[in-house]
Amino acid sequence: MRTVLPIMLVLLLASCSSVRVNYDYDKTIDFSGYTTYNYYPDMKSGLSQLDERRLLRALDSTLKSRGYRLAEEPELFVNIISDEYRGAPNNNVGVGIGGTGRNVGGGISVGLPLGGSNWKRSIQFDLVDAQRDALIWQATSESGLRDNASPSVREEQLREVVKKVFSKFPPKVK
């Protein structure tokens, strides 16, 4: 029992900070032909300036590690769109009382929501072929958001989003 409690606590904390990602891409594209990228000049990410800089630093680092380089005349344009919204509370506690007599039964149950609704952030990453002006790859992430998080925590959260989103980029050709 002593080892089960710490393991359960770690799993609970890990599940709270998970990043979910959905992908879509053009199966006819050979992604190995792309080597350069840049951001849309008029990109409106929806993030604060500080968070946008954190996200772009993480993205630059990830793309560089995969052999892509930032260029004035890129082959790919990156567009980022973000949205923050309040999610529904998903934790409830049921409290019930009941009694039974010889031939009489009864009960009462009440559901109590725990905590308030939680904030979520969705970030959509679009990769557009610059020459054809065509969307070729898209990923949308969803993760928890804490407004009162420290700058280092915010940076780590955004790094984790980029890591998870680009873990399957470029797509494997079958």
Task: Indicate where each model-derived feature is located.
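Surface-exposed short loop/turn segments
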Residues: 66, 80-134, 142
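C-terminal/domain-edge helix-coil "capping" segments
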Residues: 17-28, 115-174
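A generic local structural motif
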Residues: 24-26, 63-65, 111
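Immediate post-signal peptide segment of exported/extracytoplasmic ligand-binding proteins
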Residues: 30-36
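C-terminal motif of bacterial Sec signal peptides marking the signal peptidase cleavage site
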Residues: 12-15
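Positively charged n-region of N-terminal signal peptides that target proteins for export
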Residues: 1-5
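N-terminal segment of the mature soluble domain
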Residues: 36-87
